[in-house]
Amino acid sequence: MEDLGENTTVLSSLRSLNNFISQRMEGTSGLDVSTSASGSLQKQYEYHMQLEERAEQIRSKSYLIQVEREKMQMELSHKRARVELERAASTNARNYEREVDRNQELLARIRQLQECEATAEEKMREQLERHRLCKQNLDAVSQQLREQEDSLASAREMISSLKGRVSELQLSAMDQKVQVKRLESEKQELKEQLELQQRKWQEANQKIQELQASQDERAEHEQKIKDLEQKLCLQEQDAAVVKSMKSELMRMPRMERELKRLHEENTHLREMKETNGLLTEELEGLQRKLSRQEKMQEALVDLELEKEKLLAKLQSWENLDQTMGLNLRTPEDLSRFVVELQQRELTLKEKNNSITSSARGLEKVQQQLQDEVRQANAQLLEERKKRETHEALARRLQKRNALLTKERDGMRAILGSYDSELTQTEYSTQLTQRLWEAEDMVQKVHAHSSEMEAQLSQALEELGVQKQRADTLEMELKMLKAQTSSAESSFSFCKEEVDALRLKVEELEGERSRLEQEKQVLEMQMEKLTLQGDYNQSRTKVLHMSLNPISMARQRQHEDHDRLQEECERLRGLVHALERGGPIPADLEAASSLPSSKEVAELRKQVESAELKNQRLKEVFQTKIQEFRKVCYTLTGYQIDVTTESQYRLTSRYAEHQTDCLIFKATGPSGSKMQLLETEFSRSVPELIELHLLQQDSIPAFLSALTIELFSRQTSI
């Protein structure tokens, strides 16, 4: 806009100059008409030439001014371009530094986030461990609550039974008071005492004892009445007996005659019995002789069979001697041949031992070679990784060198354009200073490129060294493989025995692992039974209160579980926010606060106290269970062991052998039914099983009958 304004001012001045010249020419022409034509024309021509010269000078000056202004504008544009380039370079440098700082900050932030993530994971583990401990404590508390509920239920049952008994005693007292009018005053006192009995248990117990005494007196009176009735019945029976005796006395002579006849028959029968006894003795003797003869016949048949077997064996030995040519005529020859075979077996065993020792040595050598091969493979992998990293570094350096060369060429082109646009004389001091700075920058770029080239050459040299090292390692690996193949071919002849031994070792290890698993299962079952308390659920009634502590504890556990889940979700959101690198939300900043050391110490103390409490409870449970088992063994006479899940082994204390046992299996819902499994001992008592289990369907009767039978066997022995 300034250039256009200056051009318009120059044109307006030229136009005004031409107008002035034309006016002067008209004025001079009007004034000098009378002069001569030649003089006026000469003057006009000179004046016109002067005016043209002045106009030409003005035009040249304006053109010079315009050229100078264009030059200044070009210089300003060049300066502006240089300033913009310098500014862009400085901004690029600042951006590069800012990016480097930002990368460092991001790396530091990533480290912090990783540390925060590790702390969050550790905190989550601690929370999970705390949750597990709380769950264990809750299980223990629930177990205690169950025990307390059982005790409360038993207490309530006792209270209800006492109340029922009190009501019965009240009814009996009312009946006695109605029947006995003379005890009405005592009835009033008893009513007052019964009303007070509901409030005070001690007075109620005293009144119950008094009522029990009165009931005992009543029972004694009833017993006396029953005794009198029995005596009356006996007297009536005696009267009937007296009547019958009288009738029998009337029949006494006839009875005496019959008695004589019976005596005679008795003597005859005794004689017949004696003769019959003699005949039976003779018959038994003959039967014994017959049995001995039969046994002798059987023994003779057995001897003949054995003789035939021995003859067949002798014939087979003779045939073996003829076929093999061993010359075994006598037992001494056979024993000598057996001794020779044993000696051969010993020599073969020694050879086998030497072969196995050599095989073990070769296995050790093979193991060492395999270790060396693994080490060589690991070194080869490391060298390959290093080579890849060096190749990547070389590629990056080449790319960086190409970029630097492009920047250098660009700077040179810019400087060349500046040099072509401006003449040598028009350089200013600022331009020379910029040129020197550009030359210094070019020298620095040259130095940096030379350093990069040196690093590239060094990396290429290291890459060549690494390749040579990798080639040597591959050659060593091939040599080691060849050595291992030769070693394998050298001890392939004893590989079958080694495989057989390995199979035996694997079988033994499998059996050991199986036994360990069974042991763990049994220990878990024992712990489960100890924790459960070993009570019969079919006979034990569990009462739940309206304000049940276990339900409240479960509700608290559910609330704690929900709270922990929310905390885990907040922690996950915090971890995701930290991984993204963005700002942490305000709702997650509270979740990132870690507990103090005091809280951690208190929690650890609580955990230790809870663990100690659980350990003490376990010890108490174990001692109580042992006492309970001993008491059951002494009272019932049976030792109860858990073999597997829902199977129980009963061993009687009067058993003749330790292996004599019964195995019951719990079936039905919650083990309400028991089923007897077949064992060798159960096969020996089929009558008891048929009577008590199949017909009567009573396991206690079967066990008691079995105990009596075993006890009678031991006492009879």
UniProtKB/Swiss-Prot annotation:
There is a cross-link at K61 (Glycyl lysine isopeptide (Lys-Gly) (interchain with G-Cter in SUMO2)). One of its GO terms (biological process) is negative regulation of T cell proliferation. Residues 540-551 are annotated as: Necessary for interaction with MAD2L1. Phosphorylated; by BUB1. Become hyperphosphorylated in late S through M phases or after mitotic spindle damage. InterPro entries: Mad1. Component of the spindle-assembly checkpoint that prevents the onset of anaphase until all chromosomes are properly aligned at the metaphase plate. Forms a heterotetrameric complex with the closed conformation form of MAD2L1 (C-MAD2) at unattached kinetochores during prometaphase, recruits an open conformation of MAD2L1 (O-MAD2) and promotes the conversion of O-MAD2 to C-MAD2, which ensures mitotic checkpoint signaling. The modification N-acetylmethionine is found at M1. Residues 380-532 are annotated as: Necessary for interaction with NEK2. The modification Phosphoserine is found at S16, S214, S428. Homodimer. Dimerizes via its N- and C- terminal regions. Heterodimerizes with MAD2L1 in order to form a tetrameric MAD1L1-MAD2L1 core complex. Interacts with the closed conformation form of MAD2L1 (C-MAD2) and open conformation form of MAD2L1 (O-MAD2). It is unclear whether MAD1L1 dimerization promotes the conversion of closed to open conformation of MAD2L1. Formation of a heterotetrameric core complex containing two molecules each of MAD1L1 and of MAD2L1 promotes binding of another molecule of MAD2L1 to each MAD2L1, resulting in a heterohexamer. Keywords: Acetylation, Cell cycle, Cell division, Centromere, Chromosome, Coiled coil, Cytoplasm, Cytoskeleton, Isopeptide bond, Kinetochore, Mitosis, Nucleus, Phosphoprotein, Ubl conjugation. It holds the Pfam family MAD. The modification N6-acetyllysine is found at K61. This is Mitotic spindle assembly checkpoint protein MAD1. GO terms for cellular component: centrosome; cytoplasm; kinetochore; MAD1 complex; mitotic spindle; mitotic spindle assembly checkpoint MAD1-MAD2 complex; mitotic spindle pole; nuclear pore nuclear basket. A motif (Nuclear localization signal) lies at residues 79-82. GO terms for molecular function: identical protein binding; kinetochore binding. It comes from the Eukaryota. Residues 48-631 form a coiled coil. It is found in: Nucleus; Chromosome, Centromere, Kinetochore; Nucleus envelope; Cytoplasm, Cytoskeleton, Microtubule organizing center, Centrosome. Belongs to the MAD1 family. Gene3D superfamilies: 1.20.5.170, 3.30.457.60, 6.10.250.90.
